[in-house]
Amino acid sequence: RELLMGIFEKNGTGKTAAFVIPLLQK
């Protein structure tokens, strides 16, 4: 979770969400 939050802040929420959400839905 902490790693994910760091990635969100680094790359921008919208961009990262589009990449992470599909993984979470697997």
Swiss-Prot record:
| GO function terms (MF aspect) | ATP binding; ATP hydrolysis activity; RNA binding; RNA helicase activity
CC annotations in GO: P-body
Specify the superkingdom. Eukaryota
UniProt motif (Q motif) ranges: 1-10
List of residues binding ATP? N11, G12, T13, G14, K15, T16
Say what the protein does: ATP-dependent RNA helicase involved in mRNA turnover, and more specifically in mRNA decapping.
Which protein are we looking at? DEAD-box ATP-dependent RNA helicase 1
Source species of the chain? Catharanthus roseus
Task: Identify the taxonomic lineage of the organism of origin.
Answer: Eukaryota, Viridiplantae, Streptophyta, Embryophyta, Tracheophyta
